[in-house]
Amino acid sequence: MKKMNWLLLLFAFAAVFSIMLIGVFIAEKSPAGIIASIVLVCAVMGGGFTLKKKMREQGLLD
């Protein structure tokens, strides 16, 4: 069984939460919140993919 990578799991949950925030701000009709949530999704997803690439290059991922 493979070892669980908790940091990547945290990034995944943060991305899901950010996507949920987009829906909340759409319901509240808050353009600033929608834009902030979209920026947050891009930042979290980008950070997660960057971290995964670095870990793969270092041989920490299978």
Swiss-Prot record:
Keywords: Cell membrane, Membrane, Transmembrane, Transmembrane helix. GO terms for cellular component: plasma membrane. The chain crosses the membrane at residues 7-27, 34-51. It is found in: Cell membrane. It holds the Pfam family DUF5325. It is a multi-pass membrane protein. This is Uncharacterized protein YlaF. The gene is ylaF.
